[in-house]
Amino acid sequence: MLFLLLEGFLMLVFTVLDLILFYIFFESVLIPMFILIGIWGSSQQRIMAAYQLFLYTLLGSVFMLVAILGIYSQAGTADFLVLNTLEFSTSRQLVLWLAFFASFAVKIPMVPVHLWLPKAHVEAPTAGSVILAGILLKLGGYGFLRVLLPLFPEASAFYTPLIFIMSSVAVIYTSLTTLQQTDLKRVIAYSSVGHMGLVTLGLFSGNLQGIEGSIILMISHGVVSGALFLMIGSVYDRHHTREIRYFGGLVYTMPLYAIFFFWFTLANIGLPGTSSFVGEFLVFIGAFQTNTTVTVFCMTGVILSAGYSLWLFNRVLLGNPKTYPLEMTYDLTRREFYYLLPCALTVLWLGIYPNVIIDVLHLPVSTLLYQSSF
């Protein structure tokens, strides 16, 4: 029931055309997620993780609510179609932009307001982590596309250097932090923050390639990270632990699992032939046109991400095989295979033939850039 409620709120966020309704459903997502983590979390820290998620999101939403009230008092409407035709003064844009940014930055999340995410992932049940990584994080990116870029183009251009700096810090910092993690879920959680740093880099590049790349990267990240959390859930069901030091040599007892894990690891790195490569490549092309120095720093972070991803695969799947009880050594079940296979094929399909998405994105992204003059 909670998952259906959560999915319903998420669908409404992406479909409403009214700013007030957008805010209501944007924040309503928090309620079922709070309950899922607080009740069905995996350890005694679940209450703290749920409250952190609640407080971080609530703090950002206060600023967004004040900004919405300010817009409604001036425009007399909350309809996106009408608001897109209005022009706000530069000074008002700068203030309103910051208010909305405070909420979207927490949700996506950006460094330094990302601390709730690793704890939420660690404590959430597997299905909760999949929805959190696959869809919930994308609400922030959607907010940038739906609100900040079209309604406040001058402010978006003004704050682009700030976004670029925060994005580069996120990519480098999370890549280094991930190398120190000992929990499987924390590794994927911190890598998600780094990938979202690349998303914000592309969204504020101000060109077609960057924005299209960010959207593709969000889609790819949703599939890849969701699949990785499902695979972590599979080994947790067998071994009842996510501590990396406990594992080793699983390739010998779970060869099919190892194949899927290796494929999604390559996708997480952004190897050519995967959907993540298409998104990252377009993001870097777009960002390179805006700020070469920051883009080079972010490329360094991508190299570091390859390091921790391959280290994780080597530590868990390869190495000296450890002795496990017989009931822990069985390979993927038929159910697990059938929900991982579509994810793997999607990553391959979008990596080989990305035009299926790019062709759809050309018109709306071009319209966004033309109308906002960003």
Segments (PLM) and residue ranges:
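Hydrophobic/aromatic positions within or immediately flanking transmembrane alpha-helices
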Residues: Y23-I24, F54-L55, I131, F164, ...
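Juxtamembrane/interfacial segments at transmembrane-helix boundaries in multi-pass membrane proteins
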Residues: R46-M48, V62-K119, F144-L162, G210, ...
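Hydrophobic alpha-helical transmembrane segments of multi-pass membrane proteins
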Residues: L55, L98-A105, L132, L162-M166, ...
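Acidic, glycine-rich loop-and-beta core segments that form the ion-binding/anion-interacting portion
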Residues: P118-A120, A124-G128, L136-G222
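Final/C-terminal transmembrane alpha-helix of multipass membrane proteins
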Residues: V193, E336-V356
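Predominantly late transmembrane helices and immediately cytosolic-facing juxtamembrane segments
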Residues: S225-L228, Q289, T293-D331
